[in-house]
From Swiss-Prot:
GO-annotated biological processes: electron transport coupled proton transport; mitochondrial electron transport, cytochrome c to oxygen
Residues noted as binding Mg(2+) in the record, renumbered to the chain: H368, D369
Organismal lineage: Eukaryota, Metazoa, Chordata, Craniata, Vertebrata
Gene Ontology cellular component list: mitochondrial inner membrane; respiratory chain complex IV
Mitochondrial matrix side: 1-11, 87-94, 171-182, 262-269, 328-335, 401-406, 479-513
Protein name: Cytochrome c oxidase subunit 1
CDD domains given in the database record: Cyt_c_Oxidase_I
Stored PROSITE patterns: COX1 (PS50855), COX1_CUB (PS00077)
Coiled-coil annotated spans: none
Location within or outside the cell: Mitochondrion inner membrane
Membrane side Mitochondrial intermembrane: residue ranges: 41-50, 118-140, 213-227, 287-298, 358-370, 434-446
Subunit structure: Component of the cytochrome c oxidase (complex IV, CIV), a multisubunit enzyme composed of 14 subunits. The complex is composed of a catalytic core of 3 subunits MT-CO1, MT-CO2 and MT-CO3, encoded in the mitochondrial DNA, and 11 supernumerary subunits COX4I, COX5A, COX5B, COX6A, COX6B, COX6C, COX7A, COX7B, COX7C, COX8 and NDUFA4, which are encoded in the nuclear genome.
Keyword annotations: Calcium, Copper, Electron transport, Heme, Iron, Magnesium, Membrane, Metal-binding, Mitochondrion, Mitochondrion inner membrane, Respiratory chain, Sodium, Translocase, Transmembrane, Transmembrane helix, Transport
Gene Ontology molecular function, alphabetical: cytochrome-c oxidase activity; heme binding; metal ion binding
Length: 513
């Protein structure tokens, strides 16, 4: 029955599909918000009213894209679908908890939308810093609703993380060790550990903010012996691991795609890749204050956070060069998925280089809160995470649906998206270097040219999003079924047919090592 299957589901494939659909829908909302931002900034002068409504849109854009698009698709969608298939498990360890993880997200999303509908909205930025987020600057329920929304999304992610850790450690076939699991499984494991360790700190921080706003506590109010900088430390102790949570599953997917379309049986430097991911996960927890170089920390503290941040470039470099080595000498098949992977490797590296620039505390004091930072993190997210999602989608779409996408449309789609995002975000480096600050709805005329170019790019990206919807419709309408899949010996997820049956591995898998 429909309700039993989709509302009360305990099947990892169905829940994965729900996550993918929810993430795609939220992605449309987030894209719409970003188009509003770029429309406002397309020329000097006001389009939408005041800065409050602008900042509400910016805040909602960030939350929607992070918590309701990237995380549900990468961890919930691809994670749920692929992890059990890749390790030969019949399902996730806690199938009902898996369902709850998903169904906490729509209410969370509704709370976030409600926060923008009542009062003046939460125009705090996604960081929700007090005193701007306090009850003086933001009276009314908007920020409280945003906090509750984050609580629900956080609980959802923590439950999901527990589920993935248990599944990956306990549900492998007896003969399979952790070092024989595919890299995507490793990436989800590291991501889950990061979620489990970082989200409780965010929960603590926003709960304190909630009591500051409603119960007269003074955790972040100097008048009562509190300190708003404490909130920043708590938030960024979560916030920095969070950005690695957003990109690590992408690393795993890119490893699979690069290997598959190079005609290789395994990625180059498997153990190096695993240790690089674990190193990135560990280092991600000890660099948080690089987001706070301008709050007046000691020079020795700044020196430490500068060097620690730069160290992350080493394992990241290991991954980039291992991907290139995987491609090297392979029998390259120029599929759309490989194009996304190549685009990812190039653009993620560019974003990483601007990250190295920002790691220097002396330079960051000048560049902090300018469009240089916006350009940096959109290169690693809008062209890192999103390119990985798109690559994973066009690669595994035949597995999920049983149908194939039109390869020509898929390549055209990649091209449009590639041009669009680069045209949107590359000029923002110039704006940042010439001092244009973030989070303002208007700007001096001197910045007009690059803002106009950037806004044009965003509309090209919008075209790509619409084309993707068409591509998916076309695939389901044409019903080109999958005939054969290559390289199944080292890609277990394809072994059960396309799409796999409702229950796979009903008896324990026999794995010969």
């Amino acid at each position: 029955m429909f309700i039993n299957r989709w509302l009360f589901s305990t099947n990892h494939k169905d829940i994965g599909t729900l996550y993918l659909l929810f993430g795609a829908w939220a992605g449309m909302v987030g894209t719409a918000l970003s188009i509003l931002i770029r429309a406002e900034l397309g020329q000097p002068g006001t389009l939408l009213g005041d800065d409050q409504i602008y900042n509400v849109i910016v805040t909602a854009h960030a939350f929607v894209m992070i918590f309701f698009m990237v995380m549900p698709i990468m961890i919930g969608g691809f994670g749920n679908w692929l992890v059990p298939l890749m390790i030969g498990a019949p399902d996730m360890a806690f199938p009902r908890m898996n369902n709850m993880s998903f169904w906490l997200l729509p209410p969370s999303f509704l709370l976030l939308l409600a926060s923008s509908m009542i009062e003046a909205g939460a125009g705090t930025g996604w960081t929700v810093y007090p005193p701007l987020a306090g009850n003086l600057a933001h009276g009314g329920a908007s920020v409280d609703l945003t906090i509750f929304s984050l609580h629900l999304a956080g609980v959802s992610s923590i439950l999901g993380a527990i589920n993935f850790i248990t599944t990956i450690i306990n549900m492998k076939p007896p003969a399979m060790t952790q070092y024989q699991t595919p890299l995507f499984v490793w990436s989800v494991l590291v991501t889950a550990v990061l979620l489990l360790l970082s989200l409780p700190v965010l929960a603590a921080g926003i709960t304190m903010l909630l009591t500051d706003r409603n119960l007269n506590t003074t955790f972040f109010d100097p008048a009562g012996g509190g300190d708003p900088i404490l909130y920043q430390h708590l938030f960024w102790f979560f916030g920095h691991p969070e950005v690695y949570i957003l990109i690590l599953p992408g690393f795993g997917m890119i490893s699979h795609i690069a290997t598959y379309y190079s005609g290789k049986k395994e990625p180059f430097g498997y153990m190096g890749m695993v240790w690089a991911m674990m190193s990135i996960g560990f280092l991600g927890f000890i660099v948080w204050a690089h987001h706070m170089f301008t709050v007046g920390m000691d020079v020795d503290t700044r020196a430490y956070f500068t060097s620690a941040t730069m160290i992350i470039a080493i394992p990241t470099g290991v991954k980039v060069f291992s991907w290139l080595a995987t491609l090297h000498g392979g029998n390259i098949k120029w599929s759309p998925a490989l194009l996304w992977a190549l685009g990812f490797i190039f653009l993620f590296t560019v974003g990483g280089l601007t990250g190295i620039v920002l790691a220097n505390s002396s330079l960051d004091v000048v560049l902090h809160d300018t469009y240089y930072v916006v350009a940096h993190f959109h290169y690693v997210l809008s062209m890192g995470a999103v390119f990985a999602i798109m690559g994973g989608f066009v690669h595994w779409f035949p597995l999920f649906s049983g149908y194939t996408l039109n390869q020509t449309w898929a390549k055209i789609h990649f091209l449009i998206m590639f041009v669009g995002v680069n045209l949107t975000f590359f000029p923002q480096h110039f704006l940042g270097l010439s001092g244009m600050p973030r989070r303002y709805s208007d700007y001096p005329d001197a910045y007009t040219m690059w803002n106009t170019v950037s806004s044009m790019g965003s509309f090209i990206s919008l075209t790509a999003v619409i084309l993707m919807v068409f591509m998916v419709w076309e695939a389901f309408a044409s019903k080109r079924e999958v005939s054969t899949v290559e390289l199944t010996t080292t890609n277990l997820e394809w072994l059960n047919g396309c799409p796999p049956s409702y229950h796979t591995f009903e008896e324990p898998a026999y794995v010969k090592i």
